[in-house]
Amino acid sequence: MKFAVIVFPGSNCDVDMFHAIKDELGEEVDYVWHDTENLDGYDAILLPGGFSYGDYLRCGAISRFANAMKAVQKAAEQGKPILGVCNGFQILVESGLLPGALMRNENLKFMCRTVQLRVENNETMFTSQYEKDEVINIPIAHGEGNYYCDEETLKQLEENNQIAFRYVENPNGSVSDIAGIVNEKGNVLGMMPHPERAVDELLGGAEGLKVFQSILKQWRETYVVNA
């Protein structure tokens, strides 16, 4: 399986994402610059955290216009797994690939610590290796991670089982304790916590690795078993 890590000016978690795939998952991965127009050679696309384009205007607001995002849109339409973490989640929302918005944290402070997440839906291509309602420890590092959507959108997210992760103790004011959501099709996941920073016990825990293992399992079942 071959992954692409999209690198924007200001990305700073791309190396962590690359390490998670190459060294921990053991799969092929490339850094792909934001001006690429073709992602056809990749099986999964990863949008890392950071401060793309300095987070001017709004987090992710400029990145949505990058050439690579047109290719990401195409990959999403093809059903390829798209994972956006932290700033990557913000970019997915700004691009319209996921509903809602990310606002300033409720306390107006940047937060950097490990939090507990509850797996709300373990039937997605990103969460199949977890147990339903499993509680996992994953780091956060954001100033604008307060997820917001209107009541109608929240109702749709809940009815369609699109809420992948919730905070056990809400750190930022996110509506309904939401930490991560998938699109209706189930192949695009956005989450504020950083699973790529929790893939090695030496780094404090490996509970984030199952996100990437789930993607790999889905790909093998779809393309290797059926080959």
From Swiss-Prot:
Reactions the enzyme catalyzes: N(2)-formyl-N(1)-(5-phospho-beta-D-ribosyl)glycinamide + L-glutamine + ATP + H2O = 2-formamido-N(1)-(5-O-phospho-beta-D-ribosyl)acetamidine + L-glutamate + ADP + phosphate + H(+); L-glutamine + H2O = L-glutamate + NH4(+)
A GO MF label: phosphoribosylformylglycinamidine synthase activity
Pfam family, one: GATase_5
SUPFAM superfamilies per record: Class I glutamine amidotransferase-like
Subcellular localization(s) per the UniProt record: Cytoplasm
Ranges for domain Glutamine amidotransferase type-1: 3-225
Active site: C86, H194, E196
GO cellular component terms, A-Z: cytoplasm
Any GO BP annotation: 'de novo' IMP biosynthetic process
UniProt main location, coarse: cytoplasm
Function: Part of the phosphoribosylformylglycinamidine synthase complex involved in the purines biosynthetic pathway. Catalyzes the ATP-dependent conversion of formylglycinamide ribonucleotide (FGAR) and glutamine to yield formylglycinamidine ribonucleotide (FGAM) and glutamate. The FGAM synthase complex is composed of three subunits. PurQ produces an ammonia molecule by converting glutamine to glutamate. PurL transfers the ammonia molecule to FGAR to form FGAM in an ATP-dependent manner.
HAMAP family reported for this sequence: PurQ (MF_00421)
PANTHER family the UniProt entry points to: PHOSPHORIBOSYLFORMYLGLYCINAMIDINE SYNTHASE SUBUNIT PURQ
Protein name stated in the entry: Phosphoribosylformylglycinamidine synthase subunit PurQ
Organism expressing this protein natively: Bacillus cereus (strain 03BB102)
Taxonomic classification: Bacteria, Bacillati, Bacillota, Bacilli, Bacillales
